[in-house]
Protein backbone atom coordinates (compact mmCIF):
# COMPACT_ATOMS: atom_id res chain seq x y z
CA UNK A 1 0.00 0.00 0.00
CA UNK A 2 2.79 2.48 -0.91
CA UNK A 3 0.78 4.53 -3.45
CA UNK A 4 -0.90 7.56 -1.90
CA UNK A 5 -4.58 7.03 -1.18
CA UNK A 6 -6.96 9.94 -0.61
CA UNK A 7 -9.99 9.20 1.57
CA UNK A 8 -12.98 11.51 2.00
CA UNK A 9 -14.90 11.37 5.28
CA UNK A 10 -18.43 12.53 6.01
CA UNK A 11 -17.42 14.03 9.35
CA UNK A 12 -20.97 14.98 10.33
CA UNK A 13 -22.44 11.48 9.91
CA UNK A 14 -22.96 9.08 12.79
CA UNK A 15 -24.47 9.41 16.24
CA UNK A 16 -21.73 11.44 17.91
CA UNK A 17 -20.96 14.26 15.48
CA UNK A 18 -17.47 15.09 14.19
CA UNK A 19 -15.41 14.42 17.33
CA UNK A 20 -14.98 10.65 16.93
CA UNK A 21 -14.54 10.83 13.14
CA UNK A 22 -11.80 13.45 13.47
CA UNK A 23 -10.07 11.57 16.29
CA UNK A 24 -10.09 8.37 14.22
CA UNK A 25 -8.85 10.15 11.08
CA UNK A 26 -5.94 11.79 12.92
CA UNK A 27 -4.95 8.47 14.46
CA UNK A 28 -5.28 6.67 11.12
CA UNK A 29 -2.97 8.95 9.12
CA UNK A 30 -0.38 8.68 11.90
CA UNK A 31 -0.29 4.91 11.26
CA UNK A 32 -0.49 5.05 7.45
CA UNK A 33 2.01 7.39 5.83
CA UNK A 34 0.52 6.88 2.35
CA UNK A 35 -2.93 8.19 3.32
CA UNK A 36 -4.37 11.68 3.30
CA UNK A 37 -7.89 12.44 4.46
CA UNK A 38 -10.37 15.20 3.70
CA UNK A 39 -12.86 15.74 6.50
CA UNK A 40 -16.10 17.15 5.09
CA UNK A 41 -18.43 19.09 7.35
CA UNK A 42 -18.94 22.31 9.27
CA UNK A 43 -15.44 23.80 9.17
CA UNK A 44 -15.55 25.38 12.61
CA UNK A 45 -16.97 22.29 14.30
CA UNK A 46 -14.60 19.89 12.55
CA UNK A 47 -11.48 22.04 12.98
CA UNK A 48 -12.11 22.40 16.71
CA UNK A 49 -11.92 18.61 17.07
CA UNK A 50 -8.53 18.17 15.36
CA UNK A 51 -5.91 17.18 17.97
CA UNK A 52 -2.84 19.46 18.16
CA UNK A 53 -0.44 16.65 17.21
CA UNK A 54 -2.28 15.82 13.96
CA UNK A 55 -0.36 16.01 10.67
CA UNK A 56 -2.19 18.87 8.96
CA UNK A 57 -0.32 18.28 5.71
CA UNK A 58 -2.39 15.10 5.28
CA UNK A 59 -5.56 16.05 7.14
CA UNK A 60 -7.73 18.68 5.46
CA UNK A 61 -11.17 20.15 6.10
CA UNK A 62 -13.72 20.87 3.36
CA UNK A 63 -16.64 23.00 4.49
CA UNK A 64 -20.22 21.85 3.96
CA UNK A 65 -23.20 23.86 5.18
CA UNK A 66 -25.70 21.03 5.44
CA UNK A 67 -26.02 17.71 7.25
CA UNK A 68 -28.06 14.69 6.14
CA UNK A 69 -30.06 13.78 9.23
CA UNK A 70 -30.87 10.21 10.19
CA UNK A 71 -34.57 11.04 9.77
CA UNK A 72 -34.16 12.39 6.22
CA UNK A 73 -35.78 10.34 3.49
CA UNK A 74 -33.38 9.45 0.63
CA UNK A 75 -35.54 11.40 -1.84
CA UNK A 76 -35.37 14.50 0.39
CA UNK A 77 -31.59 14.22 0.68
CA UNK A 78 -31.28 13.92 -3.11
CA UNK A 79 -33.37 17.03 -3.73
CA UNK A 80 -32.41 19.29 -0.86
CA UNK A 81 -29.03 18.26 0.61
CA UNK A 82 -26.62 18.92 -2.26
CA UNK A 83 -24.31 20.94 -0.01
CA UNK A 84 -24.29 18.37 2.77
CA UNK A 85 -21.18 16.72 4.17
CA UNK A 86 -22.34 13.37 2.78
CA UNK A 87 -22.97 14.71 -0.73
CA UNK A 88 -19.67 16.59 -0.94
CA UNK A 89 -17.68 13.64 0.44
CA UNK A 90 -19.17 11.37 -2.24
CA UNK A 91 -18.63 14.06 -4.88
CA UNK A 92 -14.88 13.91 -4.22
CA UNK A 93 -14.93 10.23 -5.21
CA UNK A 94 -17.15 10.88 -8.24
CA UNK A 95 -14.74 13.61 -9.41
CA UNK A 96 -11.75 11.29 -9.01
CA UNK A 97 -10.20 13.45 -6.28
CA UNK A 98 -10.61 10.76 -3.60
CA UNK A 99 -10.35 6.98 -3.95
CA UNK A 100 -12.92 6.14 -1.27
CA UNK A 101 -15.56 7.70 0.96
CA UNK A 102 -16.47 6.73 4.54
CA UNK A 103 -19.70 7.76 6.26
CA UNK A 104 -21.53 6.76 9.41
CA UNK A 105 -24.65 8.62 8.32
CA UNK A 106 -28.10 7.80 6.98
CA UNK A 107 -27.79 4.50 5.06
CA UNK A 108 -30.66 5.13 2.64
CA UNK A 109 -29.39 8.59 1.77
CA UNK A 110 -25.83 7.30 1.34
CA UNK A 111 -27.05 4.71 -1.13
CA UNK A 112 -29.29 7.15 -3.02
CA UNK A 113 -26.65 9.86 -3.33
CA UNK A 114 -23.98 7.27 -4.09
CA UNK A 115 -26.06 5.84 -6.95
CA UNK A 116 -26.76 9.34 -8.27
CA UNK A 117 -23.15 10.55 -8.23
CA UNK A 118 -21.12 7.38 -8.80
CA UNK A 119 -23.57 5.26 -10.82
CA UNK A 120 -23.71 1.47 -10.69
CA UNK A 121 -21.49 -1.05 -12.44
CA UNK A 122 -22.84 -2.40 -15.74
CA UNK A 123 -25.07 -5.40 -15.09
CA UNK A 124 -25.94 -4.33 -11.52
CA UNK A 125 -29.40 -2.90 -10.77
CA UNK A 126 -28.77 -1.77 -7.19
CA UNK A 127 -25.82 -1.76 -4.78
CA UNK A 128 -25.77 -4.04 -1.74
CA UNK A 129 -24.14 -3.51 1.64
CA UNK A 130 -21.56 -6.23 2.21
CA UNK A 131 -19.05 -7.01 4.91
CA UNK A 132 -16.86 -9.78 6.18
CA UNK A 133 -18.12 -11.63 9.23
CA UNK A 134 -16.02 -13.88 11.49
CA UNK A 135 -16.63 -17.61 11.14
CA UNK A 136 -15.29 -20.87 12.51
CA UNK A 137 -13.17 -21.16 9.34
CA UNK A 138 -11.94 -17.58 9.06
CA UNK A 139 -14.48 -15.24 7.48
CA UNK A 140 -17.37 -15.08 5.02
CA UNK A 141 -18.96 -12.25 3.04
CA UNK A 142 -22.55 -11.42 4.05
CA UNK A 143 -24.84 -9.25 1.87
CA UNK A 144 -27.22 -7.38 1.70
CA UNK A 145 -27.16 -5.76 5.15
CA UNK A 146 -29.85 -3.14 4.71
CA UNK A 147 -29.57 -1.27 1.42
CA UNK A 148 -32.50 -3.12 -0.21
CA UNK A 149 -35.35 -4.27 2.03
CA UNK A 150 -37.08 -6.04 -0.86
CA UNK A 151 -35.24 -7.75 -3.72
CA UNK A 152 -36.12 -9.56 -6.91
CA UNK A 153 -34.50 -12.91 -7.75
CA UNK A 154 -32.37 -11.15 -10.37
CA UNK A 155 -31.06 -8.65 -7.80
CA UNK A 156 -30.24 -11.40 -5.30
CA UNK A 157 -28.45 -13.23 -8.10
CA UNK A 158 -26.42 -10.08 -8.80
CA UNK A 159 -25.56 -9.84 -5.09
CA UNK A 160 -24.17 -13.35 -5.33
CA UNK A 161 -21.96 -12.37 -8.27
CA UNK A 162 -20.68 -9.28 -6.43
CA UNK A 163 -20.10 -11.16 -3.18
CA UNK A 164 -18.19 -13.80 -5.10
CA UNK A 165 -16.01 -11.09 -6.64
CA UNK A 166 -15.29 -9.56 -3.23
CA UNK A 167 -14.45 -12.96 -1.75
CA UNK A 168 -11.92 -13.53 -4.54
CA UNK A 169 -10.20 -10.26 -3.64
CA UNK A 170 -9.98 -11.52 -0.05
CA UNK A 171 -8.12 -14.62 -1.20
CA UNK A 172 -10.85 -17.17 -1.98
CA UNK A 173 -9.94 -18.58 -5.41
CA UNK A 174 -13.25 -20.40 -5.94
CA UNK A 175 -15.70 -18.87 -3.45
CA UNK A 176 -18.85 -20.80 -2.68
CA UNK A 177 -22.24 -19.05 -2.47
CA UNK A 178 -25.42 -19.86 -0.54
CA UNK A 179 -28.77 -18.21 0.18
CA UNK A 180 -29.84 -17.52 3.76
CA UNK A 181 -33.12 -19.40 4.22
CA UNK A 182 -35.51 -20.86 6.79
CA UNK A 183 -34.21 -24.35 6.08
CA UNK A 184 -31.46 -26.13 4.19
CA UNK A 185 -33.84 -28.42 2.27
CA UNK A 186 -34.22 -27.55 -1.41
CA UNK A 187 -38.00 -27.19 -1.07
CA UNK A 188 -37.82 -24.54 1.68
CA UNK A 189 -38.33 -20.81 1.13
CA UNK A 190 -40.74 -18.52 -0.71
CA UNK A 191 -41.00 -18.04 -4.47
CA UNK A 192 -38.29 -15.36 -4.52
CA UNK A 193 -35.82 -17.65 -2.76
CA UNK A 194 -36.73 -20.58 -4.99
CA UNK A 195 -36.41 -18.52 -8.19
CA UNK A 196 -33.07 -17.11 -7.02
CA UNK A 197 -31.80 -20.59 -6.26
CA UNK A 198 -32.75 -21.61 -9.79
CA UNK A 199 -30.77 -18.69 -11.27
CA UNK A 200 -27.73 -19.40 -9.11
CA UNK A 201 -27.87 -23.12 -9.69
CA UNK A 202 -28.04 -22.66 -13.46
CA UNK A 203 -25.01 -20.35 -13.54
CA UNK A 204 -21.79 -22.20 -14.40
CA UNK A 205 -19.75 -19.25 -13.11
CA UNK A 206 -21.19 -19.51 -9.61
CA UNK A 207 -20.28 -22.21 -7.09
CA UNK A 208 -23.77 -22.40 -5.59
CA UNK A 209 -24.17 -24.54 -2.48
CA UNK A 210 -27.90 -24.18 -1.84
CA UNK A 211 -29.26 -22.83 1.44
CA UNK A 212 -27.84 -22.06 4.87
CA UNK A 213 -29.91 -21.45 8.00
CA UNK A 214 -29.33 -18.70 10.53
CA UNK A 215 -27.61 -21.04 12.97
CA UNK A 216 -25.00 -21.84 10.30
CA UNK A 217 -24.23 -18.21 9.46
CA UNK A 218 -20.97 -18.27 11.40
CA UNK A 219 -19.96 -21.83 10.59
CA UNK A 220 -17.91 -20.88 7.54
CA UNK A 221 -19.59 -23.59 5.45
CA UNK A 222 -19.68 -21.19 2.50
CA UNK A 223 -17.69 -18.10 1.50
CA UNK A 224 -20.62 -15.86 0.52
CA UNK A 225 -24.08 -15.69 2.11
CA UNK A 226 -26.78 -13.79 0.20
CA UNK A 227 -30.07 -12.39 1.51
CA UNK A 228 -32.25 -9.31 1.12
CA UNK A 229 -31.46 -6.22 3.17
CA UNK A 230 -34.29 -6.72 5.65
CA UNK A 231 -33.17 -10.22 6.64
CA UNK A 232 -29.49 -9.30 6.53
CA UNK A 233 -29.86 -6.27 8.76
CA UNK A 234 -31.95 -8.18 11.30
CA UNK A 235 -29.42 -11.05 11.30
CA UNK A 236 -26.54 -8.64 11.85
CA UNK A 237 -28.27 -6.69 14.64
CA UNK A 238 -29.33 -9.91 16.40
CA UNK A 239 -25.73 -11.14 16.21
CA UNK A 240 -24.48 -7.88 17.72
CA UNK A 241 -27.08 -8.09 20.47
CA UNK A 242 -26.18 -11.68 21.34
CA UNK A 243 -22.48 -10.79 21.45
CA UNK A 244 -23.15 -7.88 23.82
CA UNK A 245 -25.29 -10.09 26.04
CA UNK A 246 -22.73 -12.92 26.20
CA UNK A 247 -19.79 -10.64 26.97
CA UNK A 248 -21.81 -8.59 29.45
CA UNK A 249 -23.04 -11.68 31.27
CA UNK A 250 -19.51 -13.12 31.33
CA UNK A 251 -18.12 -9.91 32.87
CA UNK A 252 -20.80 -9.84 35.55
CA UNK A 253 -20.17 -13.48 36.48
CA UNK A 254 -16.40 -12.98 36.59
CA UNK A 255 -16.84 -10.20 39.14
CA UNK A 256 -18.91 -12.32 41.55
CA UNK A 257 -16.55 -13.37 44.30
CA UNK A 258 -12.91 -14.29 44.80
CA UNK A 259 -13.18 -17.74 43.20
CA UNK A 260 -14.64 -16.34 39.96
CA UNK A 261 -11.98 -13.64 39.77
CA UNK A 262 -9.24 -16.22 40.35
CA UNK A 263 -10.61 -18.48 37.61
CA UNK A 264 -10.85 -15.47 35.29
CA UNK A 265 -7.20 -14.60 36.00
CA UNK A 266 -6.13 -18.18 35.24
CA UNK A 267 -8.21 -18.23 32.04
CA UNK A 268 -7.04 -14.79 30.86
CA UNK A 269 -4.55 -16.17 28.26
CA UNK A 270 -7.50 -17.93 26.60
CA UNK A 271 -10.29 -15.41 27.22
CA UNK A 272 -8.41 -12.30 26.07
CA UNK A 273 -7.66 -13.40 22.48
CA UNK A 274 -11.12 -14.99 22.26
CA UNK A 275 -12.81 -11.72 23.27
CA UNK A 276 -10.54 -9.76 20.92
CA UNK A 277 -11.62 -11.90 17.98
CA UNK A 278 -15.27 -10.92 18.41
CA UNK A 279 -15.04 -7.23 19.32
CA UNK A 280 -17.58 -5.33 17.14
CA UNK A 281 -15.08 -2.53 16.43
CA UNK A 282 -12.82 -5.04 14.70
CA UNK A 283 -15.46 -5.70 12.04
CA UNK A 284 -16.86 -2.20 11.50
CA UNK A 285 -17.07 -0.94 7.94
CA UNK A 286 -19.32 -2.37 5.23
CA UNK A 287 -18.99 -1.71 1.50
CA UNK A 288 -21.71 -0.50 -0.85
CA UNK A 289 -20.87 -3.03 -3.54
CA UNK A 290 -22.02 -2.31 -7.06
CA UNK A 291 -21.03 1.36 -7.27
CA UNK A 292 -18.26 2.60 -9.55
CA UNK A 293 -16.31 3.76 -6.54
CA UNK A 294 -15.47 2.65 -3.01
CA UNK A 295 -18.07 3.74 -0.44
CA UNK A 296 -17.83 2.39 3.10
CA UNK A 297 -20.66 2.58 5.62
CA UNK A 298 -19.55 2.82 9.24
CA UNK A 299 -21.92 1.87 12.05
CA UNK A 300 -23.56 5.09 13.25
CA UNK A 301 -22.79 4.23 16.86
CA UNK A 302 -19.17 3.21 16.29
CA UNK A 303 -16.51 4.58 18.62
CA UNK A 304 -13.22 6.07 17.38
CA UNK A 305 -11.60 2.65 17.17
CA UNK A 306 -14.52 1.31 15.15
CA UNK A 307 -14.47 4.28 12.76
CA UNK A 308 -10.74 3.80 12.30
CA UNK A 309 -11.46 0.21 11.25
CA UNK A 310 -13.93 1.53 8.65
CA UNK A 311 -11.14 3.78 7.33
CA UNK A 312 -8.91 0.71 7.06
CA UNK A 313 -11.58 -1.13 5.05
CA UNK A 314 -11.76 1.89 2.73
CA UNK A 315 -7.97 1.93 2.33
CA UNK A 316 -7.89 -1.81 1.70
CA UNK A 317 -10.63 -1.74 -0.93
CA UNK A 318 -9.31 1.39 -2.65
CA UNK A 319 -5.80 -0.07 -2.80
CA UNK A 320 -7.15 -3.33 -4.22
CA UNK A 321 -9.35 -1.54 -6.76
CA UNK A 322 -12.42 -3.51 -5.68
CA UNK A 323 -14.98 -1.81 -8.00
CA UNK A 324 -12.77 -2.31 -11.06
CA UNK A 325 -12.14 -5.96 -10.19
CA UNK A 326 -15.83 -6.65 -9.64
CA UNK A 327 -16.63 -4.81 -12.87
CA UNK A 328 -14.05 -6.85 -14.80
CA UNK A 329 -15.32 -10.10 -13.26
CA UNK A 330 -18.93 -9.27 -14.13
CA UNK A 331 -17.99 -8.13 -17.64
CA UNK A 332 -16.22 -11.43 -18.27
CA UNK A 333 -19.21 -13.44 -17.08
CA UNK A 334 -21.77 -11.27 -18.86
CA UNK A 335 -19.65 -11.35 -22.01
CA UNK A 336 -19.67 -15.12 -21.83
CA UNK A 337 -23.43 -14.99 -21.45
CA UNK A 338 -23.29 -16.36 -17.88
CA UNK A 339 -23.12 -19.89 -19.18
CA UNK A 340 -25.57 -22.34 -17.70
CA UNK A 341 -24.56 -25.70 -16.34
Curated annotation (Swiss-Prot):
Top EC class, one word: transferase
Record gene name: plsX
HAMAP family xrefs: PlsX
GO (cellular component) term, any one: cytoplasm
Role: Catalyzes the reversible formation of acyl-phosphate (acyl-PO(4)) from acyl-[acyl-carrier-protein] (acyl-ACP). This enzyme utilizes acyl-ACP as fatty acyl donor, but not acyl-CoA.
Species assigned in the record: Saccharophagus degradans (strain 2-40 / ATCC 43961 / DSM 17024)
Gene Ontology BP terms: fatty acid biosynthetic process; phospholipid biosynthetic process
Subunit details: Homodimer. Probably interacts with PlsY.
InterPro entries noted in UniProt: FA_synthesis, Phospholipid_synth_PlsX-like
Biochemical pathway: Lipid metabolism; phospholipid metabolism
Predominant location category: cytoplasm
Intracellular or extracellular location(s): Cytoplasm
Enzyme Commission code: 2.3.1.274
Cysteines joined through disulfide linkages: none
Substrates-to-products reaction catalysed: a fatty acyl-[ACP] + phosphate = an acyl phosphate + holo-[ACP]
Name of the featured protein: Phosphate acyltransferase
GO MF term set: phosphate:acyl-[acyl carrier protein] acyltransferase activity
Keywords in alphabetical order: Cytoplasm, Lipid biosynthesis, Lipid metabolism, Phospholipid biosynthesis, Phospholipid metabolism, Transferase
Family: Belongs to the PlsX family.
Amino acid sequence: MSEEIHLSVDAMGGDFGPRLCVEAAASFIAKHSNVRITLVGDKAAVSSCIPPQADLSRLHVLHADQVVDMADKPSHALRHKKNSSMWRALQLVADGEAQACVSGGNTGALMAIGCHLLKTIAGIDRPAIAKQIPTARGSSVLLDLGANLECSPQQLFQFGLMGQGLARVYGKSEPTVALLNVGSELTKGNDIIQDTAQLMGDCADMHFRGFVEGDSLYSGEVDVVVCDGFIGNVALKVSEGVAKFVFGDLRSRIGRGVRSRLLAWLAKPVLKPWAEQFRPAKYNGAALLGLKGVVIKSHGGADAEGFEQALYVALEQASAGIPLKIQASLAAMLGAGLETK
